[in-house]
């Protein structure tokens, strides 16, 4: 019979594959467009935000004239002070900033406490407890 007889089986299966045709790369000429160069760039901008709903209060302004940039910005810090930063940048001195901090609300002037003179009450003697033993 067929029981116990060796059976020949292939070692693995593989699907045939197609090879893609490889073409040599083609050189494509690109046109180089030179960026416009401004030898003395200039700009100026600024904004101011005062939002009563969110409490957001900040502003900024900046100008550039050639290689010199000057500007400032301010905002309200979480502790309630206004921080203002004034800055300048140029090729000779680099970037420099000065920071100012100012309270938003003027400090309230508190008057010195009034000292009232009060007379001490008359002194009374405390009652003495007496114990009797029988």
From Swiss-Prot:
Gene Ontology cellular-component annotations: extracellular matrix; extracellular space
Repeat in keyword set: yes
UniProt region (Disordered), positions on chain: 38-80
Sequence repeats: 23-26, 111-114
Record domain Chitin-binding type R&R: where: 40-106
PROSITE patterns per the UniProt record, alphabetical: CHIT_BIND_RR_1, CHIT_BIND_RR_2
Domain of life: Eukaryota
Tagged with keyword Repeat: yes
GO MF term set: structural constituent of cuticle
Entry keyword set: Cuticle, Repeat
Pfam family membership, one: Chitin_bind_4
InterPro entries per UniProt: CHIT_BIND_RR_consensus, Insect_cuticle, Insect_Cuticle_Struc_Prot
Domains: entry comment: The tetrapeptide (A-A-P-[AV]) repeats found throughout the protein are also present in many proteins constituting the protective envelope of other species.
Task performed by this protein: Component of the cuticle of the larva of Tenebrio molitor.
Protein name in UniProt: Larval cuticle protein A3A
């Amino acid at each position: 019979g067929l029981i116990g007889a060796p059976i020949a089986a292939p070692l693995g299966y593989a699907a045939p594959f197609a090879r893609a045709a490889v073409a040599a790369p083609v050189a494509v000429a690109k046109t180089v467009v030179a960026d416009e160069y401004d030898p003395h760039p200039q700009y100026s901008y600024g904004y101011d935000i005062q939002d009563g709903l969110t409490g957001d209060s900040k502003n900024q302004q900046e100008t550039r004239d050639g290689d010199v940039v000057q500007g400032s910005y301010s905002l309200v810090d979480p502790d309630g002070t206004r921080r203002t930063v004034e800055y300048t940048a140029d090729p000779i001195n680099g970037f420099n900033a000065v920071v100012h901090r100012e309270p938003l609300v003027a400090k309230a002037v508190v008057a010195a406490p009034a000292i009232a003179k009060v007379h001490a009450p008359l002194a009374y003697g405390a009652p003495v407890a007496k114990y009797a033993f029988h």
